[in-house]
Amino acid sequence: MVSNDETMDLYNDLKNQILNLGNDIEIRPTKKYVAFRRKQQFVGIVFLKEKLKLYLNADSSQLQDPFNKVRDVSNIGHYSSGNSEIIVSHPSDIPVAFSLIRQVYEKS
């Protein structure tokens, strides 16, 4: 996984918020991404040099996304499971991403 310090800071902020959702969350790192699981994977995070790609295990139509940040990737090849993608490249993206992650976690 290639990333810089700022990308790792974004990941660590997100990871801490995700883990605070509940004590039933398991982290499973793979070669290509990091999976966060409850009963099943609800989000996968792919590290890129200057951003994170989050794959949410929900259809984009099921998510409340007032900022239109979610991209439907159900017909596009990608790492991780999940049909909805959101990009996190700046700390200001974290609250929006986390609100979407929370929605998927609560449904899992």
Regions found by a protein language model. Give the residues of each.
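Generic secondary-structure transition motif, activating predominantly at the C-termini of alpha-helices
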Residues: 4-5, 22, 71, 102-105
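Charged, terminal alpha-helix-loop-beta segments
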Residues: 2, 19, 42
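Solvent-exposed, charged helical/coil patches
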Residues: 1-14
